[in-house]
Amino acid sequence: MSDESRPSPAETPATTFAETSAETSAAGRSPARTAAVIPAAGRGVRLGPGAPKALRALGGTPMLIHAVRAMAASRAVSLVVVVAPPDGAGEVKSLLDAHALPERTDFVVVPGGETRQESVRLGLDALPPEYGIVLVHDAARPLVPVDTVDAVIDAVREGAPAVVPAVPLADTVKQVEPAAAPGEPEPVVATPERARLRAVQTPQGFDRATLVRAHGTVTDDVTDDASMVEQLGLAVVVVPGHEEAFKVTRPLDLVLAEAVLARRRLNDGF
């Protein structure tokens, strides 16, 4: 693999698509293609000392490679852009070169920024014009099933400007007044209705023009890209997520991810 994209077959469109900017960039043109952007510049301090979070090993393979393969597993995704740490693009390129990746998918590595939002913007800037649907995926969600990826893409194709996979909450959630110092008691101010709450996952899918507009307009710090689209006053829709698309943030998450991966390899030959 080189820095230049490898040739890949054109994405095959479904029978009918909604006529949105995500699917038809202009009258008479073929449907827009789908790319995935993976910001992988974070350090992941909650996992403890060691390599950056995206480069931590899972089943002997860096989590980033698992995340890249998860995006490429969808036949709709023909390009994956990995946004590396500002000083680590060369290392990430070498990492991708050293692992088997699908030949039908192109892979590009670009240096990231100081913040996640800046890194996603740099990933968007690297996309060729024919890509009108964009997935943004956390490198720390290495085990997302391909059915979830495809469900997000399908919802964007059907006309949604922004789509997030999500799962119902198992725990009751309390809204609190934050304590003045860590460890102090925090007063509860509300208990949201759990049936109306969802835990959001990735990949999140977008009409490209909508996501570019959001990143060019919203300057507040946000925890995900869909929140930026919400601030534009546009609709964000939820599709079913998956319990295995959890985020590896703490050491216990890594233990769970190892168990899930071991079960897949035993049962599915993954």
Swiss-Prot record:
Its EC number is 2.7.7.60. CDD domains: CDP-ME_synthetase. The record marks 46, 53 as: Transition state stabilizer. The record marks 194, 247 as: Positions MEP for the nucleophilic attack. It catalyses: 2-C-methyl-D-erythritol 4-phosphate + CTP + H(+) = 4-CDP-2-C-methyl-D-erythritol + diphosphate. SUPFAM superfamilies: Nucleotide-diphospho-sugar transferases. Catalyzes the formation of 4-diphosphocytidyl-2-C-methyl-D-erythritol from CTP and 2-C-methyl-D-erythritol 4-phosphate (MEP). This is 2-C-methyl-D-erythritol 4-phosphate cytidylyltransferase. It comes from Streptomyces coelicolor (strain ATCC BAA-471 / A3(2) / M145). The gene is ispD.
